[in-house]
């Protein structure tokens, strides 16, 4: 991230192939480094900006220069002069908030002269009256009638004062309001008429209610001084999926008989401000905070909806969007309920006030309200939009298309502007129509991966593909992908590391002998096991591995064929069954049988099961996300339920992340997005297996929903040799608890009460989160989950109870599939 203190440090150059747009180049800037270090850097040649946020000041000077720099850029911009003008029009924003956002605004009478098109034709709002003037002179009679009716209207309630002010971007910060008692009709009319003379087109004169200080119920402490008013400033940011998120709330407290503004009061937290005014009861303060959050997020949602209907010219460029918003509220007591009333929208002032609060020497003592930097969600949005800019147009080769559960890949690629080229064994795969280039190549026999990698590299070169990266998210194709990257000179973890992680017994045995340094060593997390290729291997293994144990396919996926075995006869019986039923790819496509059907026996460890999804770049851990799994239906190990974020204590969560990270490094996995399955035992984390690719099932979707981090985008960036900029301590925006549906257990429900259409309709209404994992309802002995159904909530308990009720109503819960038991780990 770079800070440019002068417009002269930046320049715009025409963008080739994009008429009317320009690239922004940086020749000089302040750069920031860990430990608080800053440097003034000169860039030769200049660097290309991938995101621009301008400080749009008022009037001539640098603000105007910054506005011109921000216009019509090829890179994303977080503000523009055109959007700022809209937000600085109090009348327009009040109408927008009242009509679109359902946000309380002051009762307002507006006299507008040649109003902008966005104001025309809007539905009338309660307490918001627009009077369109044909001219600025000769309006005395109309003004008097309208003002008199307004001052007598019920919309003002018990208001004793009104303010008269000008509205329009020209007047922002340049004029003081004029206060009048409500009873002084003549004075109000005279002020309105005087201000009408200053109007230009698309400007207005506002007569608005001035709310007295809310009479807060006193706490147990001494009564506060009379007449204290609270002005609340909320900063809200645009996050993943254009969803508003409250970032921080800061308040000012002052005398109620004087205008309370940003620079004439000290910033403080909402809790401190309300306590100074006599409200210290925790539940009431929490209720006020929730109302402020709802109103602020609704305000930004209304602004984003307005922007969606604007042309690129009206926004100031194709890539111009409002990424953050400051909303100023007055706190009123309407009907005995403390209600925030939106006064105006701004950006810089609210952000500045929050920064001032964070900069106080006592900030570390302020508690949870000061834990997160106000700019954190904004910076995440900047980085996300910057990443999209970097990746747009990148040429990527995808090896293996996968099934219906991976349909999101093609949708996301279109959204990100990626140019995908696909290698796939199925010539009729639906994804063949969704890519730039389709290469049909039979790669089902993975014991020929080295030969196939050379052949594929020749095909890529013959087609003249200029690739930026190559990656796979499909288990069967991971080693082939690493070999192909090696042939093409593209970034990837080494083939040796991929082979080590792909073969489960090899993973465990390698890590068992990895004693460090560094310490704690990966050997602490590995589990004793024995590879099985024959009945003789089984006989030897039952004497080497403590029983009960777990038998599974060496190269398997989706827990197919995984079984708890109690003694030697069960081991022999299960080995015989698997070698008979699952001999090749045709017996069960997509679970690794192209590698053969060798098995392993590993020690069964007691404990709770967890997934850790990691993003690594150059051997450094960039991000980690931990989720919890419910108890499985022994002797099988098909997943039943899951919860995110984890309910583990912070120390245990850190142990899981470090164990997963060390196991990946121990296998040589240095670059990529990986999924590591572990159990937390009394002695610490124990490794189940490493999946050297992005987590499957619902994981990418849940992480995107809760944290705003897209593992797919991170994976393709790493594949292109680009380091993803991810939040080091991402905040979850809620909780998700889900349950798997199996055809063997839910065929009747999935064909009736919980049909695909019913589940999709509930998903579309936001009542559940559906992740479809299979296309058809086909029962079988060796099955994978058909779908995942989840519910969201502000707490794991609420999400769990919602899901349980839903499963009972849909027929997913039952005696043979006790959902309450599967969710019991999440209490």
Swiss-Prot record:
InterPro entries: ATP-grasp (IPR011761), BL00235/CARNS1_N (IPR041472), CARNS1 (IPR031046). Binds 2 magnesium or manganese ions per subunit. Mn(2+) 1 binds at residues 677, 689. One of its GO terms (biological process) is carnosine biosynthetic process. Its cofactor is Mg(2+); Mn(2+). Its EC number is 6.3.2.11. ATP binds at residues 542-611. Keywords: ATP-binding, Ligase, Magnesium, Manganese, Metal-binding, Nucleotide-binding. Mg(2+) 1 binds at residues 677, 689. Mg(2+) 2 binds at residues 689, 691. The keyword Transferase does not apply. GO terms for cellular component: cytosol. One of its GO terms (molecular function) is ATP hydrolysis activity. It comes from the Eukaryota. Residues 516-720 form the ATP-grasp domain. It is an enzyme of class 6 (ligase). Disulfide bonds: none annotated. It catalyses: beta-alanine + L-histidine + ATP = carnosine + ADP + phosphate + H(+); 4-aminobutanoate + L-histidine + ATP = L-homocarnosine + ADP + phosphate + H(+). Homotetramer. This is Carnosine synthase 1. The lineage of its organism: Eukaryota, Metazoa, Chordata, Craniata, Vertebrata. The gene is CARNS1.
